[in-house]
């Protein structure tokens, strides 16, 4: 009886936090198997769901556990139901029919797919800023056109959108070699259309794009402001594929509703499926990225050096890659194998322009800037008052303290009047969820971050 109450409470919390489509995908499909010795065994039908539950929903398990069991419940995830083979048999049968393409078409040579083989899910570093987008991309790569169609991923430059598009295409071809897949930047699609139009070969163009099983378009914002004929052709291509239940995945530097210069009917179609954002990597993710990028270079990057670098570049992955290139160049010239903080600081001096500004951001500076923005005092932020504007400021400050510093959760909680670390976890998850849904809040936080730095 308690297990049912416990699970229903979790679903209630999840419904408040998640969008409808995410709730249906991540929460409804999950199931609590048992709760014993303060461990909740939770069945997830897909292994990639674990990261979402662990990073985005774990705190609601803790809250529900205290409410129902008066104890801290730890989740344990399983991906096969005990003594239950029915679901796997159904899934296997589904896969057999899903990829039985009809009519049969000649597969596209890999060189013509536009894909880059080096970009896979295996070497994509997941973190809080991209977990939803990665999970959606994985879901699409398992169930073409049955999960989210189109899938629209947006975020700033250098955050991994192109990597994810290629990973989807490569994963599909690994499992379905005869699938017709095409990756192409929007600008190249436009040029291809204009070339075929000029040569009078529009039937060839239509056949190329409208016979695909998977179309991956990068930087769709490039279509904004283009001539009516160009947007009309993409509109018709989109409709032709969608009507045949073929998968479309798009990326952009902004959300569909902020794509100016596009016909409204296109914007509407971009929102038909699922829209996910990618935000800059947090401190832990930046360290993981640096570890992945440096482990095979033949140099010894000390752990404190990686932490130092992670603290200097927080806007995108390209900055981290550029810093690594700067460092390895100096190391090669000086014939150095051990990369210390001093070596790293020297190497990235030009990139940072002023090394004297490479300071750790104190939490009180974050509190000050957030307080100034929302008209809330630091005393109120550290207190326990629950007025809406104070709660928002407090949660935003906690969120930024975790994103912009390497302080531990208990340390952050202490700086906010001795709050428990679970409060920090909840605040971070709450703001992260709101950012994904509210562009105005996302812009507010970006504005605050610029003032902090």
Swiss-Prot record:
InterPro entries referenced in this protein's UniProt entry, alphabetically: AAA+_ATPase, Chromosome_initiator_DnaA, Chromosome_initiator_DnaA-like, Chromosome_initiator_DnaA_CS, DnaA_C, DnaA_dom, P-loop_NTPase, Trp_repressor/repl_initiator
Annotated region described as Domain IV, binds dsDNA, given as residue ranges: 332-453
Record Gene3D superfamilies: 1.10.1750.10, 1.10.8.60, P-loop containing nucleotide triphosphate hydrolases
GO BP terms: DNA replication initiation; regulation of DNA replication
Single GO term (MF): ATP hydrolysis activity
Residues reported in the UniProt entry to bind ATP: 158, 160-162
Annotated region (Domain III, AAA+ region), positions in chain: 114-331
GO cellular component, one term: cytoplasm
Region (Domain I, interacts with DnaA modulators): 1-74
SMART domains cross-referenced by the UniProt entry: AAA, Bac_DnaA_C
Keyword Cytoplasm on entry: yes
Source organism superkingdom: Bacteria
Region (Domain II): 74-113
Compartments, record wording: Cytoplasm
Keyword annotations from UniProtKB, A to Z: ATP-binding, Cytoplasm, DNA replication, DNA-binding, Lipid-binding, Nucleotide-binding
Quaternary structure and partners: Oligomerizes as a right-handed, spiral filament on DNA at oriC.
UniProt free text on domains: Domain I is involved in oligomerization and binding regulators, domain II is flexibile and of varying length in different bacteria, domain III forms the AAA+ region, while domain IV binds dsDNA.
HAMAP family in alphabetical order: DnaA_bact
Family recorded in the similarity comment: Belongs to the DnaA family.
Biological function: Plays an essential role in the initiation and regulation of chromosomal replication. ATP-DnaA binds to the origin of replication (oriC) to initiate formation of the DNA replication initiation complex once per cell cycle. Binds the DnaA box (a 9 base pair repeat at the origin) and separates the double-stranded (ds)DNA. Forms a right-handed helical filament on oriC DNA; dsDNA binds to the exterior of the filament while single-stranded (ss)DNA is stabiized in the filament's interior.
Name under which the protein is recorded: Chromosomal replication initiator protein DnaA
Source organism of the structure: Streptococcus pneumoniae (strain P1031)
Gene: dnaA
